[in-house]
């Protein structure tokens, strides 16, 4: 029986029994190898590795994540709502709703979601998924 394929960079490093710093992962979009800081950021963002049928594995570099997020927002934007409206639409509390950063694609934690509500900022539906603003992108934007 086949073992499940690793979904994170850390799982891949553990499966291969090599240090994370020695992992060489190409970006699926630009084919550049991710730098160590990008490997760590990939896992912190809650992204998953991309596996091909031939068992090649890819990730997404920070530059391509930003470009993808921008492209999707410009082409697949659906609507913007407040936090309370989002809870009404999804019939769930904000903490249970998956929301990614509209710039870097990081999965927002509860504090980032609540901060968006506190600041009366909007959440955006893009390609059937919710987007907000993470603390890092919010601090530089």
From Swiss-Prot:
<dbReference type="GO" id="GO:0030430">
    <property type="term" value="C:host cell cytoplasm"/>
</dbReference>
<keyword id="KW-0479">Metal-binding</keyword>
<dbReference type="GO" id="GO:0003677">
    <property type="term" value="F:DNA binding"/>
</dbReference>
<dbReference type="GO" id="GO:0006355">
    <property type="term" value="P:regulation of DNA-templated transcription"/>
</dbReference>
<dbReference type="GO" id="GO:0042025">
    <property type="term" value="C:host cell nucleus"/>
</dbReference>
<keyword id="KW-0804">Transcription</keyword>
<dbReference type="GO" id="GO:0008270">
    <property type="term" value="F:zinc ion binding"/>
</dbReference>
<keyword id="KW-0244">Early protein</keyword>
<comment type="subunit">
    <text>Forms homodimers. Interacts with ubiquitin-protein ligase UBE3A/E6-AP; this interaction stimulates UBE3A ubiquitin activity. Interacts with host BAK1.</text>
</comment>
<feature type="zinc finger region">
    <location>
        <begin position="27"/>
        <end position="64"/>
    </location>
</feature>
<dbReference type="GO" id="GO:0052150">
    <property type="term" value="P:symbiont-mediated perturbation of host apoptosis"/>
</dbReference>
<keyword id="KW-0805">Transcription regulation</keyword>
<keyword id="KW-1119">Modulation of host cell apoptosis by virus</keyword>
<keyword id="KW-1035">Host cytoplasm</keyword>
<dbReference type="InterPro" id="IPR038575">
    <property type="entry name" value="E6_sf"/>
</dbReference>
<comment type="similarity">
    <text>Belongs to the papillomaviridae E6 protein family.</text>
</comment>
<keyword id="KW-1048">Host nucleus</keyword>
<feature type="zinc finger region">
    <location>
        <begin position="101"/>
        <end position="137"/>
    </location>
</feature>
<keyword id="KW-0863">Zinc-finger</keyword>
<dbReference type="GO" id="GO:0039648">
    <property type="term" value="P:symbiont-mediated perturbation of host ubiquitin-like protein modification"/>
</dbReference>
<keyword id="KW-1090">Inhibition of host innate immune response by virus</keyword>
<keyword id="KW-0010">Activator</keyword>
<keyword id="KW-0945">Host-virus interaction</keyword>
<dbReference type="Pfam" id="PF00518">
    <property type="entry name" value="E6"/>
</dbReference>
<dbReference type="GO" id="GO:0006351">
    <property type="term" value="P:DNA-templated transcription"/>
</dbReference>
<protein>
    <recommendedName>
        <fullName>Protein E6</fullName>
    </recommendedName>
</protein>
<dbReference type="GO" id="GO:0039502">
    <property type="term" value="P:symbiont-mediated suppression of host type I interferon-mediated signaling pathway"/>
</dbReference>
<dbReference type="InterPro" id="IPR001334">
    <property type="entry name" value="E6"/>
</dbReference>
<dbReference type="GO" id="GO:0052170">
    <property type="term" value="P:symbiont-mediated suppression of host innate immune response"/>
</dbReference>
<comment type="function">
    <text>Plays a major role in the induction and maintenance of cellular transformation. E6 associates with host UBE3A/E6-AP ubiquitin-protein ligase and modulates its activity. Protects host keratinocytes from apoptosis by mediating the degradation of host BAK1. May also inhibit host immune response.</text>
</comment>
<keyword id="KW-0238">DNA-binding</keyword>
<keyword id="KW-0862">Zinc</keyword>
<keyword id="KW-0899">Viral immunoevasion</keyword>
